[in-house]
């Protein structure tokens, strides 16, 4: 869906955006009809039901490797660091015991989002993660939930900016600065005490809670554009407008085959990948820009967007669910991607459909929240893996890492590694 004329006018007159002017790329229904859940080159290997668990005391899900603004995953003084969304497991809490007094881990897992906290882990090996604890003390974050974002190592002094999402009440992109301290024994993240809210959905480009009570606005991922050197950020949003008011027009349809013109209730799915630009490299002041990619009539969620810059191309990845697809479309939980030669597009859906790495049909919920790193490694967490009959095992732990090859507009699954294998691409020695 293209931007309204008033929105473009505001953009042209904006102090930070300068002469930026572009139309969002449309991920069309015709593109999404090409999604093939049975293509082995875009299917994640099966996860065994006997997987190991990182912790018996906490669930983990969205995983955020410490990195620099160009995407390089870094270690510090030889220690790799990841942040994860974390929630305590409650095996002895009466509210999570069933009628027979047994722990209902499935219900505990389903309730985790309401108590999500940002925690950190460290390792000498890029796996075998040691739990470090909370990043922010209780009460530092101004909302009840701490949702995903990106930790950025700023310099060799150990300063870190954690961009994340403040949720409930509302949803805001926020930043908190702290530092990393290392020793021979381990790692400590310290002084994450002053949270600054950067921006919220504006209602012009991005849907607000007032426009749709089930709106999506989260998952900041800052980066420096390798071409212009400016600091930008992608994030998940929904296209602005009252719920149900969007039109699935010719652009959103794309060249669909006969029999696919009727889209039913697809107007309710209005996901997009948002963009903002910073005033300078400090990242203290930001201005919202129009979406880079819209999925009106295709999908309602484009979570955790992030870039890989390779071979002069911009690879823009996001994750999405089967259940958030619009009526008449389907696709696996997993990674979707778009590729272009410029930050502002236009973009092309990778592998023609957008699908890069999906769960296998026989285990549709085995993994989620993938993060594609510049070395081609892809990390994710285990959600649930089928066991006997209709039963399944809850994960809440790191999944096996896989490697994908990016070749032009195409991608290929190549290798599988150990659970939670997230090696640094570069070691930073603190001064």
Swiss-Prot record:
Superkingdom of origin organism: Bacteria
Active site feature: 62 (nucleophile), 303 (proton donor/acceptor)
Top-level enzyme category: transferase
GO biological process, one term: carbohydrate utilization
GO MF assignments: levansucrase activity
Record carries keyword DNA-binding: no
Pfam families, A to Z: Glyco_hydro_68
Signals that turn on the gene: The upstream region of the gene contains a phage-associated promoter element (PAPE), which also includes the first 48 nucleotides of lscB and is essential for expression of the gene. Even though the upstream region of the gene is sufficient to promote expression, the expression level is enhanced by the presence of the 48-bp N-terminus of lscB. Expression is induced by the transcriptional regulator LscR, which is able to bind specifically to lsc upstream PAPE sequence. Transcription is temperature-dependent.
Subcellular localization(s) per the UniProt record: Secreted
Cellular component annotations (GO), alphabetically ordered: extracellular region
Reported phenotype of the disruption mutant: Disruption mutant does not exhibit a levan-deficient phenotype. The lscB-lscC double mutant is completely defective in levan formation and can be complemented by either lscB or lscC.
Annotated positions for site Transition state stabilizer: 219
The reaction(s) this protein catalyses: [6)-beta-D-fructofuranosyl-(2->](n) alpha-D-glucopyranoside + sucrose = [6)-beta-D-fructofuranosyl-(2->](n+1) alpha-D-glucopyranoside + D-glucose
InterPro entries per record: Glyco_hydro_68, Glyco_hydro_beta-prop_sf
Keyword Glycosyltransferase recorded: yes
Extra remark beyond the main annotation: Strain PG4180 contains three levansucrase-encoding genes: lscA, lscB and lscC. Of the three copies, only lscB and lscC have been shown to be expressed while no expression was observed for lscA under the tested growth conditions.
Function: Catalyzes the synthesis of levan, a fructose polymer, by transferring the fructosyl moiety from sucrose to a growing acceptor molecule.
Protein family membership: Belongs to the glycosyl hydrolase 68 family.
Name of the protein this chain belongs to: Levansucrase LscB
């Amino acid at each position: 869906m293209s931007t309204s004329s008033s929105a473009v006018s505001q953009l042209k007159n904006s102090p930070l955006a300068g002469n930026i002017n572009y139309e969002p790329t449309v991920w069309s229904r015709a593109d999404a009809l090409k999604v093939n859940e049975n293509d082995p080159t875009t299917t994640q290997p099966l996860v065994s039901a006997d997987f190991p668990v990182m912790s018996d005391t906490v669930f983990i899900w969205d995983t955020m490797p410490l990195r620099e603004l160009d995407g390089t995953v870094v270690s510090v003084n030889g220690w790799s660091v990841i942040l994860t969304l974390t929630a305590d497991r409650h095996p002895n809490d009466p509210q999570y015991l069933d009628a027979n007094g047994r722990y209902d881990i499935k219900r505990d897992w389903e309730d985790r989002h309401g108590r999500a906290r940002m925690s950190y882990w460290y390792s000498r090996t890029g796996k075998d993660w040691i739990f470090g604890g909370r990043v922010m003390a209780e009460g530092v974050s101004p909302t009840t939930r701490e949702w995903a974002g990106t930790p950025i190592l700023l310099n060799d002094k150990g300063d870190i900016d954690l961009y994340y999402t403040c949720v409930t009440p509302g949803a805001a992109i926020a930043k908190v600065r702290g530092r990393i301290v290392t020793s021979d024994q381990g790692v400590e993240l310290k002084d994450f005490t002053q949270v600054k809210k950067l921006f919220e959905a504006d209602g012009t480009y991005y849907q607000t809670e007032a426009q749709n009570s089930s709106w999506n606005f989260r998952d900041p991922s800052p980066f420096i554009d390798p071409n212009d050197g400016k600091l930008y950020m992608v994030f998940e949003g929904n296209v602005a407008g009252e719920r149900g008011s969007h039109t699935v027009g010719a652009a959103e349809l794309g060249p669909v085959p006969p029999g696919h013109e009727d889209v039913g209730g697809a107007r309710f799915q209005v996901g997009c990948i948002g963009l903002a630009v910073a005033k300078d490299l400090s990242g203290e002041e930001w201005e919202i820009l129009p979406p880079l990619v819209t999925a009106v009539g295709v999908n309602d969620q484009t979570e955790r967007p992030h870039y890989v810059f390779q071979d002069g191309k911009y690879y823009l990845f996001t994750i999405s669910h089967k259940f958030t697809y619009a009526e008449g479309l389907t696709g696996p939980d997993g990674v979707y991607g778009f590729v272009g030669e410029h930050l502002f597009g236009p973009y092309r859906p990778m592998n023609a459909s957008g699908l890069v790495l999906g769960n296998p049909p026989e285990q549709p919920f085995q993994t989620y929240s993938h993060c594609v790193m510049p070395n081609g490694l892809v990390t994710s967490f285990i959600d649930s893996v089928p066991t006997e009959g209709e039963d399944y095992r809850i994960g809440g732990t790191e999944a096996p890492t896989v490697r994908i090859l990016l070749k032009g507009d195409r991608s290929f699954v190549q290798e599988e590694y150990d659970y939670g294998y997230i090696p640094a691409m570069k070691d930073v020695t603190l001064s």
